[in-house]
């Protein structure tokens, strides 16, 4: 392996900070964005012009947050800081100036991990990718097949301006998609004479037709043009010259209404080769004339004018947290402005102070709305460290000001050549969001204008210059350069060795000599995202399967004992570190104290730095967050060193699954259609056991009849059922609970109406007031069980904020260990997923020549058609590594070391393993990678040799325990009286339209009838059926389904005379209801009902 290959491997395994996108954007907001908004906002003058209120943005202050991050999570509070800004109120008449520091609202702060804590939940603001403001030139074909061109000027906020040509070579303009106006009318309205325009254009002869057309319409002066403009833009209103002037002014030349933004001004200057200063962000006459000139050049096909590709990343920009927040602050401040103006007018001028004028509510509401309900503010995916990291690097085209799923066509979703090294071509969801939600590539970063950049090494005369930092280029700059891929072979001095090098130039592929190359990519992994870069032998997988592999790694459940992959890519350490799930040393120093809850590092100056560890905390996805120290007392540590493993980490590396022994062979049909056959070892040795923590909550509320009480005294519950409750009636920590057990005892007062007749009788006789409360306790739901790990009690006395009407809130956290079982979903890293179909005893599994039983049997037919051969390479590499007792790191795209490199490497490792003493059977040159297995049940060898090896296999979050569900009796929908649907509502199985057809096709009339009546919504019938079953009598004939009655009533309510009649013409009264529920039957239900029917 040459030295350059080692350098490439190093570049591939060293990545920039992966959460920088979030952090740097929020920092920009605090340093610049917020001040910009406050400055743009002032001064505010009242309607008379007497008073002026100035906000001094540069002097804003943030107070220390009320709670720290952990405390905010515990109290369901928001981790936020109070914003104060200095305001100056100037009275123009008296010259009096009042200055005051005013509270303007709470600003949620970003945690070190790039997240926000809102109402106790961790949230992430997803980056949005939108069309960049600027000027765009497009061509369209009209219905006669003739090409017309148009130019759109798109601002950051304000009205769109669109110029277009038509078949008569006339130029038109549209404002915000309104009616067409002759372009020269706009020029005249802007105060430009014919000569002003003609002097600016390179081909004025084309434009003269538009001037003539304007003259023919009788619009020859500025005033007439303004009237015409007003008529077109405000039809139906009486036109006036002053109105037209004001309209034009506010639409395009008023900075409050029209803003190109820094980016828009930069893009327009670049496209039209103008030199307008950056701070002039409204439209200028020069902009409009240059746009017209460029459009005419396009039409005449001269002057090197080119069309724009709107899907090119040079024309799309990323809005990160800071900018999204800035836009929201602007909305809040605009609402505030109205309030301030009103208060200025209403109040006494002399006694007004800034504090009386400024009301923080509108700003607080705007910020709260953004973090609480914006489409881009998402509940963080915390299943494992990779899921968390990917969520922070996600880039979405949806959201306010972006696209919608329905409207987005194929072009937007497609992979574009400019994505190279910027957005990952692999990682995107399957389904309706495909291509709209992307992931940032590993080395990509977002520049100050919001364009995505990717790094390169400069090449001069065929030699790589690696001194200093790499050069970052945005998509439009890169188009002008010849860029070679990251895996070109170079010698010691960095000279490119090949005679011809493949390069990308202007979105095309060419082959050039090394001297013509401008840049070389930094690393082969810079093209793909973090999740995709964790897949070894990625280059051998079909893209669709690699996509599934990337997405499924994010769904891997953290296991009880994580294990690092035998075959990795070298990025595992950094993913674990940047995800924020592992504690990292902030200083160089020495570990002076370690236990399960904290690690103390003493720096060289002798100062102590304490790192607190998380113990069995619940994540957003109910998985378990837990830290295990990996340093010992007295160990020296350096800045950035991992001190403890988090969930799904081992030794500071990400460890999503387990390395298990896999054989690719069919076994009695148990791995048909992607099913997976596993050994009992995975269950017994807790290889795939995970801990899940469920949260149960109950409120004691104030009711009309008095307060609800949390207590141990629960009516009609035996003492043994209360064994685990403390004197308050709350479960003790450490208790083991099963479904139906009481977690928190609660009684609710009940009124007179709630009492059954026999209780009223007793009270009438004995005159004593029985305890009139009913049991409303929090119980463990069906199918759940586990151990109580935490109980939290919130009351107003302790200073907790409670929901309105609640006196006390109790939360109980129950942890359960889930072993792997039939029905759980498992997957490898190459998109090879399946459901466990059977768990076999160890002794029945096929076994190797040395007697080791395999752990998993996969179907070999899952490989060829899906073309994800990477799994086979991983399997054999893992087999070699396990026999050599080492771990292997393989950078994806390894062809730079030579052709067929993966194959050669794996073969070499297998041969090396076979040379070890007693291991000659590990590799058979006649059948490389295959072994002859024996059947565990009979001891007979199988017919054919089988591919066997170690692969990293994951258990996914789709667990059968959360999905399986059954119902015998349960709740019904109020209107239709049909059973509810879904596991959460204890619902039934829907017998839909197609199932009805199937039964009809077989003529199964009675089955069908009972399914549609007695088993569903015939209220009287189902009670009678229950009665008959209990008494052992035959089930009576079904009656009318309730949903039929609802339909009849709906038709009658439309005024249709519609009814149901018997054979002899008698109308059936649908309104006559048999009351199915007597409020509280005094005898057991079925007896009382039975008596009624017998009567």
UniProtKB/Swiss-Prot annotation:
The keyword Transcription applies. Its EC number is 2.7.7.6. One of its GO terms (cellular component) is DNA-directed RNA polymerase complex. It comes from the Bacteria. It catalyses: RNA(n) + a ribonucleoside 5'-triphosphate = RNA(n+1) + diphosphate. GO terms for molecular function: DNA binding; DNA-directed RNA polymerase activity; ribonucleoside binding. GO terms for biological process: DNA-templated transcription. Residues 1069-1095 are annotated as: Disordered. InterPro entries: DNA-dir_RNA_pol_bsu_ext_1_sf, DNA-dir_RNA_pol_bsu_external_1, DNA-dir_RNA_pol_su2, DNA-dir_RNAP_su2_dom, DNA-dir_RNAP_su2_hyb_sf, RNA_pol_bsu_bac, RNA_pol_bsu_CS, RNA_pol_bsu_protrusion. Keywords: DNA-directed RNA polymerase, Nucleotidyltransferase, Transcription, Transferase. PROSITE patterns: RNA_POL_BETA. The keyword Chloroplast does not apply. In cyanobacteria the RNAP catalytic core is composed of 2 alpha, 1 beta, 1 beta', 1 gamma and 1 omega subunit. When a sigma factor is associated with the core the holoenzyme is formed, which can initiate transcription. DNA-dependent RNA polymerase catalyzes the transcription of DNA into RNA using the four ribonucleoside triphosphates as substrates. NCBIfam families: PRK00405.1 (NF001616), rpoB (TIGR02013). Belongs to the RNA polymerase beta chain family. This is DNA-directed RNA polymerase subunit beta. It comes from Prochlorococcus marinus (strain NATL2A).
